Curated annotation (Swiss-Prot):
Family annotation (InterPro entries): GlcNAc_PI_deacetylase-related (IPR003737), LmbE-like_dom_sf (IPR024078), Mycothiol_biosynthesis_MshB (IPR017810)
EC assignment: 3.5.1.103
PANTHER family, A to Z: 1D-MYO-INOSITOL 2-ACETAMIDO-2-DEOXY-ALPHA-D-GLUCOPYRANOSIDE DEACETYLASE, N-ACETYLGLUCOSAMINYL-PHOSPHATIDYLINOSITOL DE-N-ACETYLASE-RELATED
Swiss-Prot/TrEMBL keywords: Hydrolase, Metal-binding, Zinc
GO BP terms: mycothiol biosynthetic process
Molecular function terms from GO: N-acetylglucosaminylinositol deacetylase activity; zinc ion binding
Main function: Catalyzes the deacetylation of 1D-myo-inositol 2-acetamido-2-deoxy-alpha-D-glucopyranoside (GlcNAc-Ins) in the mycothiol biosynthesis pathway.
Entry's cofactor comment: Binds 1 zinc ion per subunit.
Protein name stated in the entry: 1D-myo-inositol 2-acetamido-2-deoxy-alpha-D-glucopyranoside deacetylase
Annotated Zn(2+) binding sites: 11, 14, 154
Species this chain originates from: Tsukamurella paurometabola (strain ATCC 8368 / DSM 20162 / CCUG 35730 / CIP 100753 / JCM 10117 / KCTC 9821 / NBRC 16120 / NCIMB 702349 / NCTC 13040) (Corynebacterium paurometabolum)
Enzyme's top EC category: hydrolase
Amino acid sequence: MTRRLLLVHAHPDDETITTGGTIARYLSEGAEVTVVTCTLGEEGEVMDPPYAQLVADQADQLGGYRIAELTRALAALSEPAGPVLRPRFLGGAGRWRDSGMAGTPAADHPRAFASADRIAADGPVALLAGIIRELRPQVVVTYDQVGGYGHPDHIAAHTVTTAAVDAAAASGLPGEQWAVAKLYWTVAGRGQIDRGVAAFAETELPGDWSVPESASLPAHDDAALTALIDTRDVAGRKVAALRAHATQLAVAPCGTAFALTNLIAQPVLTEEAYILVRGTAAPGPDGLERDLFAGLE
């Protein structure tokens, strides 16, 4: 069986922060991996001072620049001897715009992804269902129902992906129907976050970074996790991909921590956690799947 994995993310950098190790691991194992990004991240803040004027209320060129960052990040995640993973944008680059955080003026933009007409014939659900029918992935990954940390575009990506998985398996759309075998949410486990933050006590971080209370970082109870993917063998590729998103984040010299523009340290996880929400789990002796394709071959 040719293994095919589709990951749906809201903005450039989300693919690396939450699932970069998983992408790199499955590419190294020869799986067909596709990352669909729903917006260009136009409303992001900028960490790198030379590019600070690219933001939405100035030059409004950040989205185009982030295409280049995403391209470099996906190349970094790719197997050196294999094909280079390329970006794919839902509806094409620029079809939908970053909606910004809840309550900001960006939410009122006519192209804001969070308020897109999802049931339109050319809306995000139909377009993503078309991609699913085209690629025929056994496994699809997106966010949980709160989008990980509450960003409207992450919540919309969750809603759109869930509906698209249903639509791809049903009648009424062009193309041959396809039933996704397993749908996962990308999450972090509370234990992972607690251990990662505790390790900062012995980690040299940049002087202007702050160490958070572990409980302030979003995570799910460990008991809710259904899969843990070991990505230690490709950790260097994940770190390189994080560094490619230089307008959005910085990686500590040690490579085990990163910070967004708020300069709050977060651990670079070398196990990536998931919750299976559709399909049949095939856990190992510890009660967890160690392969997203477990039970399918």
